[in-house]
Regions:
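Mixed-charge (Asp/Glu-Lys/Arg
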Residues: 1-7, 12-134
Length: 134
């Protein structure tokens, strides 16, 4: 059995231009995002993934979590005219987060304002060009 998840990166975005900024992304999808109040979500992330995302790397890394509807048949709709994925994706950078004594998972918080949309991708790529995601 091959281990395809060696470094916790599912997708890499690269831009053109002389600086060619890159961004590594770990993807998760869930029907169980917990509303934390104060404009935040809570999500239990496996300890291994937490550790991989909080370390310093040459290419900045973020976690993108797709909130899905409870009803599986509502997740996605594909026709010749459109691809519709229900709900919203959010991003978070765990760079510099503290070590944990937890052995299985770490509950992280994600700001609801951190929607993973076109504007966010543009901003994240500009931050990656400068070398850090905040």
């Amino acid at each position: 059995v091959q281990d395809f998840d060696r470094d916790g990166v599912d997708v890499q975005l690269r831009a053109g231009g002389s600086m060619r900024p890159s961004l590594d992304i770990q993807l998760k999808a869930t029907v169980n995002l917990v509303e934390a109040g104060d404009g935040e979500w809570r999500y239990p992330l496996r300890r291994r993934n937490y550790d991989l995302l909080r370390e310093t790397t040459v290419v900045p890394r973020i976690l993108v979590i797709l909130e899905l509807p409870k009803e599986e048949s509502s997740w996605i709709n594909v026709t010749a005219e459109e691809l519709v994925i229900r709900r919203c994706a959010y991003w978070v950078s765990l760079l510099g987060h503290p070590e944990t004594k937890n052995t299985d998972s770490v509950t992280i918080t994600i700001k609801k304002s951190n929607r993973f949309d076109v504007d966010a991708v543009k901003s994240l790529m500009e931050q990656a060009r400068r070398g850090a995601i905040s």
